[in-house]
Amino acid sequence: MAAPGENLKINGDRLWNSLMEMAKIGPAVAGGNNRQTVTDDDGEGRHLFQSWCTAAGMTMGLYQMGNMFAHREGTDADALPVYVGSHLDTQPTGGKYDGVLGVLSGLEIIRTLNDLNIQTKHQIVVTNFTNEEGTRYAPALLSSGVFVGIHTQ
């Protein structure tokens, strides 16, 4: 008998297609990306991410420092949330997967749970932290630092 979740697999093609769709926004040298924070390309990437989260039945919150938190409710409102994610902004010559893979992997987890009609006890929150690269606004990790209390607004 299979253990719970033993046969749980993401849709790799769907994740790849999402990565390639996001990579069309702010293409840069050598196949990388340039989606620096608070630029039109960053805004377009954030809008695309929000549309995918909405399509997956998640509710989107925009919080301090522009951090995006997409919520998938759990069955126990008192259970602590599980956070997964990273950032969508890039360096001027950023890699195609840097940061974005963490955000879109979290989204793919939600899509897979939805496909399999799996409810979780804990709320799952897919996060896009703003200005993680720090290219335009120092320091790097600014918004996640505010979120965890290292920096103040």
Which residues does each PLM region occupy?
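N-terminal capping segment at the start of a domain
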Residues: 2-39
